[in-house]
């Protein structure tokens, strides 16, 4: 039984929701920051933080698990291991930051946000 286990469904089945988080995480890793809704950014944060914590371990098992979680996207996994994780090595969590934007999405008036890594190699 799933007592007290609550996750946002985003009105999607489980597989679609997991695919959404994987795709958002890959975009965040590749670009350093992405613009999405506040709800998706808040739901994405723990998923990405677990990936970064896993990448900081630098073991073969961690690399294989990370590749499995990112659906064998080796480009994103390599960037996470070689560029992002070393920058966040001294940090114990809190790898991402969420900014709420004043603008809203045109179609449904959803509040937008930017989620980004606190330290990122592509940062200006």
Swiss-Prot record:
PROSITE patterns linked to this entry: RIBOSOMAL_L17
Signal peptide: none
One MF term in the entry's GO annotations: structural constituent of ribosome
Pfam family, one: Ribosomal_L17
One Gene Ontology cellular component: cytosolic large ribosomal subunit
InterPro entries reported for this sequence: Ribosomal_bL17, Ribosomal_bL17_CS, Ribosomal_bL17_sf
Keywords, comma-separated and alphabetical: Ribonucleoprotein, Ribosomal protein
GO biological process: translation
Origin superkingdom: Bacteria
PANTHER family (UniProt xref): LARGE RIBOSOMAL SUBUNIT PROTEIN BL17M, RIBOSOMAL PROTEIN L17
Homology family: Belongs to the bacterial ribosomal protein bL17 family.
Record note on quaternary structure: Part of the 50S ribosomal subunit. Contacts protein L32.
The protein, known as: Large ribosomal subunit protein bL17
Taxonomic source organism: Persephonella marina (strain DSM 14350 / EX-H1)
